[in-house]
Amino acid sequence: AGPWAATLLEESGINSKFTIDHVRGSHLIVNLSLKNALVLQAPGERRIVFVIPLDHERALLGTTEHTHDLADPIVCTDAESEYLLSILNQHLSEPLPTSHIVSSFAGVRPIVRPRDAVIGDMSSASRDSEIEVSDRLISIFGGKWTSARHLGEKVASLV
């Protein structure tokens, strides 16, 4: 159920020792020709932003991290676009104008934590996953695309 896993369990009357914080990550596609990917330090922050060439003319720029209410639309806000572009422009000799933004998109990351724990800074929150078994129900909390196969293998071994 992805970001809705904890809600689904609650609405089903199943108690879990985990919950999920929802973090929106937004990205921009920009007209920018790069030969190599870049990792940029966000000035004054402990965050990084990446710039990955998509083809000879465009690059993927991201990402942001903002707590997200699942009742709200999952979109890249104007403020996030400005934030990402400003970080990129601090590292370019010639700033990229907003007219070079081709498109934007956003997604929600499910950040797992024990129900009684509090996470202050989402940038430092764990991207790990947790597996919880309740009778014949296997629930997966958190995780990342890069570890999805390994997580799937762990779940398959429980079946």
Give the residues covered by each predicted segment.
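Short glycine-/small-residue-rich Rossmann-like dinucleotide-binding loops
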Residues: 1-3
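C-terminal catalytic lobe of FAD-dependent flavoproteins
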Residues: 7-61, 66-159
